[in-house]
Regions:
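Sec-dependent N-terminal signal peptides of Gram-positive bacterial secreted proteins and lipoproteins
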Residues: 2-30
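Hydrophobic beta-strand positions
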Residues: 56, 129-130, 352
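Penicillin-recognizing serine hydrolase domain
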Residues: 120-124, 226, 230-389
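Boundary regions of SH3-family modules and the immediately adjacent low-complexity/disordered segments
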Residues: 33-37, 97-117
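Residue-level detector of high-confidence beta-strand sites
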Residues: 67, 106, 137-140
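Active-site-adjacent loops and short helices of periplasmic peptidoglycan-processing enzymes
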Residues: 117-279
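Beta-loop motif signature
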Residues: 30-95, 99
Length: 389
């Protein structure tokens, strides 16, 4: 009986091995095999993707190098063409490479269309490049759609602070009331704070202005708003009134700092029914333009990399400034404001002036690569003749 069972086990194992071998042979027989019929050089020609379909392979087509959908705004330069045979069919393929030559290989010509790729930003959900001189957009992406803007909101707050200071040196030295238990608690919060408010200590308008601009301190921004208008609620009403006076139809504020009400309620500073400030990229750019026009000192103040304020280091997270990772001398960036909350994502308002060009203001909202995409956006803006000084 045992020997019979063993016999059947051996037969079953042989069947499985035979079946497995058959499957293996079948896969090998049906595997894609491309052979080269002819190859010729061609004049270097620019192409870009026709749609999201298609991929770049090695010439034997047994290794994928890149999918076109992951390179939505790339220009591919073709230098060779070949006729490749696959089974009974033949097709014309181009040997292409991106500008840097870091990605190259063969692709069926039908996946491409002649000409350089139109400019675009891959990550920013909303963006704009504005000519500061004319106030006209030179490039935009969903720029009229309002969305949360995090600490970029402080540009409006700082405008109203500078409006009240009105160049008066003595006003800068006025002491701001920072005794609120909510603001003191916020200043100690690792996620919502920034510049520490010490109980029984006094801070001037200038100190809180630097903390709000450079360190993006939320408690400093709220305290300044209360100093300007008398209360947090009145200041937010003033923010909205200012937006209305500028005809910003896609701007609505509920926060002086840019924090959402879902965070502010823990400190007693929630206001209104909406959760967040909702502003379009275009309206953010217009706020920045008004700020620079009326109070150009914001460029000098905003270009400071770091500053010790009342014994605390205020670090400017604008990494496009001189000496920082994303600095480019040709772009000459001298401002303006970063922002982040999980809801708003990474946001950045940049500005600079290239030699012989008008000043540019750029806005990218909810952009995980806010600095590299701002670099690209500024370069694109300067490529338009309308930006010439």
């Amino acid at each position: 009986m045992k020997s019979g069972k063993a016999k059947w086990l051996v037969l079953a194992l042989m069947f499985v091995l035979t079946l497995g071998a058959g499957l293996s042979l079948q896969v090998t027989a049906d595997a894609a095999v491309y052979s080269t019929v002819s190859t010729a050089t061609m004049t270097k020609t620019a192409y870009h993707k026709k749609s999201t379909a298609g991929a770049i392979y090695n010439q034997a087509h047994n290794r994928k190098i890149a999918s076109l959908k992951t390179y939505p705004n790339t220009t591919w330069y073709a230098t060779q063409k070949a006729t490749l045979k696959h089974g009974n069919s033949k097709g014309i393929y181009y040997y292409v490479a991106n500008k840097s030559g870091s990605v190259k290989g063969w692709i069926w010509h039908g996946y491409l269309t002649k000409g350089k790729a139109p400019f675009g930003l891959k990550y920013a959900k909303n963006a704009i490049a504005m000519d500061y001189t004319t106030g006209k957009a030179v490039w935009s992406k969903s720029a009229n759609t309002a969305r949360p803007i995090a600490s970029v909101s402080k540009l409006m707050t700082l405008y109203l602070v500078l409006q009240k200071v009105d160049g008066n040196a003595s006003t800068w030295n006025q002491v701001v009331d920072t005794s609120s238990k909510g603001l003191i608690a916020m200043s100690k919060s690792s996620s919502c704070g920034g510049f520490l408010f010490q109980t029984g200590h006094s801070y001037t308008v200038r100190e809180l202005y630097d903390a709000a601009l450079l360190d993006s301190s939320n408690n400093a921004a709220i305290a300044l708003g209360e100093w300007v208008a008398g209360s947090n609620a009145k200041f937010i009403q003033q923010m909205n009134a200012q937006a209305k006076s500028w005809n910003l139809g896609k701007a609505s504020f509920v926060s002086a700092s840019g924090l959402e009400n879902s965070d502010l309620k823990a400190f007693g500073y929630a206001y209104g029914t909406a959760n967040a400030n909702m502003v379009s990229a275009k309206d953010v750019a217009l706020i920045a333009r008004h700020l620079i026009q009326d109070y150009p000192q914001i460029l000098t103040d905003g270009a400071v990399g770091s500053k010790t304020v009342d014994g605390q280091l205020c670090y400017n997270y604008n990494n496009m400034l001189s000496g920082r990772k994303y600095y480019k001398a040709s772009l000459n960036v001298d401002g303006l404001k970063t922002g982040y909350t999980p809801l708003a994502g990474y946001c950045f308002v940049g500005t600079g002036q290239q030699a012989g060009k008008h000043r540019v203001i750029t806005v990218v909202l909810h952009d995980i690569n806010e600095f590299t995409e701002t670099q690209s956006l500024m370069k694109q803006a300067y490529s338009y003749s309308s930006m010439n000084a």
